[in-house]
């Protein structure tokens, strides 16, 4: 039973009586599933763990980013706060939220954010149209989501397919001044490409998992 400890092939080899690895959490990218399969070890996760908490946290981070809360807080503590230091900030009610990955957390995020943003769009190639709530507009590619969204919230698991998925091509399709929140796994975002997008002004106030 674990939460954060990595279960590698070496760990599995050193525990010959191991029968099951059960993770407290939805993701299991820290578990070497191939090594477990070879050793006959079962792997289990907790798919409903923290769904509401992560979705609420993602929305809070998105709003903090849009309203420049962190910078304002820093300025207040430094005694340099000025109400126009960030210029005119956008209203979420005029913005489109784009969700990458419409699983449990992505759907909860869409549900709690739908009355905050003007529109909610989502990309998830593994779902059929009937799996999309009525208040979520489906987009059919990451590039389409990048073009439509003012705020991008990432809720996809880390797999060989999604590793580095948000890269230079994705950022190039974005509007200038887009906000990015990644509460999934840091490796989904190509960090060097993100830094270039940040330097160019395409991305504003990015928040991403490590």
Range-by-range predicted roles:
Residues 15-20, 39-41, 117-118, 176-178, ...:
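A short helix->loop->beta-strand "cap" motif at the edges of active sites that frequently abuts
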Residues 39, 47-96, 108-111, 115, ...:
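Phosphate-binding beta-alpha-beta segment of Rossmann-like dinucleotide-binding domains, i.e.
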Residues 84-176:
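Rossmann-like dinucleotide/phosphate-binding beta-alpha-beta segment
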Residues 6-19, 32-35, 160-180, 191-195:
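Rossmann-fold NAD(P) dinucleotide-binding segment
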Residues 43, 170, 176-210:
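Rossmann-like dinucleotide-binding domain for NAD(H)/NADP(H)
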Residues 1-73:
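Phosphate/diphosphate ligand-binding glycine-rich loop within oxidoreductases
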Residues 4-5, 26, 150, 156-158, ...:
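Short glycine-/small-residue-rich Rossmann-like dinucleotide-binding loops
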Residues 1-2, 23, 153-154, 182, ...:
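Redox-cofactor binding/interface segments in oxidoreductases and associated redox assembly factors
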């Amino acid at each position: 039973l674990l939460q954060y400890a990595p279960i590698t092939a070496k760990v599995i080899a050193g525990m010959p009586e191991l029968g099951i690895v059960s993770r407290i959490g939805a993701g299991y990218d820290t578990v070497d599933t191939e090594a477990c399969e070879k050793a006959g070890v079962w792997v289990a996760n907790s798919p409903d763990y923290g769904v509401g908490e992560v979705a609420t946290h993602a929305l809070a981070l998105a709003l903090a980013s849009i309203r420049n809360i962190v910078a304002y807080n820093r300025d207040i503590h430094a005694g340099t706060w000025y109400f126009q230091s960030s210029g005119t900030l956008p209203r979420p009610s005029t913005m489109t939220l784009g969700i990458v990955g419409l699983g449990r957390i992505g759907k909860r995020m869409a549900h709690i954010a739908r009355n905050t943003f003007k529109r909610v769009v989502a990309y998830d190639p593994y779902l059929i149209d009937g799996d999309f709530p009525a208040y979520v507009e489906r987009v059919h590619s990451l590039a389409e989501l990048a073009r439509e969204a003012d705020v991008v919230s990432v809720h996809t698991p880390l797999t060989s397919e999604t590793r580095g998925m948000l890269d230079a091509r994705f950022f190039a399709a974005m509007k200038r001044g887009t906000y990015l929140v990644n509460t999934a796994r840091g490796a989904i975002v190509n960090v060097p490409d993100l830094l270039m997008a940040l330097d160019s002004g395409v991305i504003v106030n990015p928040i991403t998992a490590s």
